């Protein structure tokens, strides 16, 4: 439903390497500081290229149906959260902000995983990177933990994101602009 509201579609997804420096085997060891500058927390294996977890979620368009694609976290040294930069320090652009500017985007609608890390960081990067409105579709997001998800919603809203419940609410919002 969200894709039908867009003139252009962007796909971003993790594409991790089996030798990533931030990997841990046990979920109990997840989300602990790594001491690394471009991979701040430990994570269990996810979105490893060539695995089921690397694929797009059921119901999403195929990769070739998107207008712009970002694969992030390919380098085993880097574990970025946002879709706009390949690194946590936000020095290595993925080109997404530049592409959106070239397309004269005025509104960006965001949904994805995980609300409290990748979605939040992407939304904050988009808000800093352009003059467009950033709308977040809550129904199209899932997070890691309820406490950090709630904090992420508040942080995105405080930064200027328009957080709406679902695609129906987004359509209503857009039609009233």
Question: What are these language model-derived features?
Answer:
Residues 1-2, 119-129:
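Histidine-anchored nucleotide/phosphate-binding helix
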Residues 2-107:
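Active-site alpha/beta core segments
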Residues 162-172:
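Short acidic-hydrophobic, aromatic-tinged amphipathic segments that line or gate anion-handling sites
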Residues 16-17, 114-118:
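Gly/Ser/Thr-rich loops at beta-strand to alpha-helix junctions
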Residues 5-7, 130-133:
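A short helix->loop->beta-strand "cap" motif at the edges of active sites that frequently abuts
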Residues 109-112, 131-145:
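A short glycine-rich beta-strand->turn/loop micro-motif centered on a GG-aromatic cluster
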Residues 70-72, 137, 164:
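Hydrophobic residues at beta-strand termini and immediately following loops
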Residues 147-159:
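Short, aromatic/basic amphipathic alpha-helical patches
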């Amino acid at each position: 439903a969200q894709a039908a509201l867009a003139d252009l579609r962007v796909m971003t997804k993790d594409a991790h390497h089996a030798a990533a420096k931030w990997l841990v085997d046990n979920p109990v060891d997840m989300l602990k500081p790594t001491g690394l500058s471009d991979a701040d927390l430990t994570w269990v294996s996810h979105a490893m290229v060539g695995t089921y977890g690397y694929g797009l979620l059921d119901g999403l368009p195929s990769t070739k149906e998107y207008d712009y694609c970002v694969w992030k976290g390919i380098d085993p040294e880097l574990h970025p959260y946002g879709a706009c930069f390949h690194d946590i320090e936000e020095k290595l652009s993925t080109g997404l902000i530049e592409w959106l500017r070239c397309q004269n985007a005025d509104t960006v609608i965001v949904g994805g995983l995980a609300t409290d890390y990748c979605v939040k960081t992407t939304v904050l990067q988009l808000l800093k990177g352009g003059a467009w409105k950033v709308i977040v579709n809550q129904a199209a997001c899932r997070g890691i933990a309820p406490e950090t998800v709630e904090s992420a919603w508040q942080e995105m809203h405080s930064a200027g994101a328009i957080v709406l419940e679902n695609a129906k609410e987004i359509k209503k919002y857009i039609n009233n602009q």
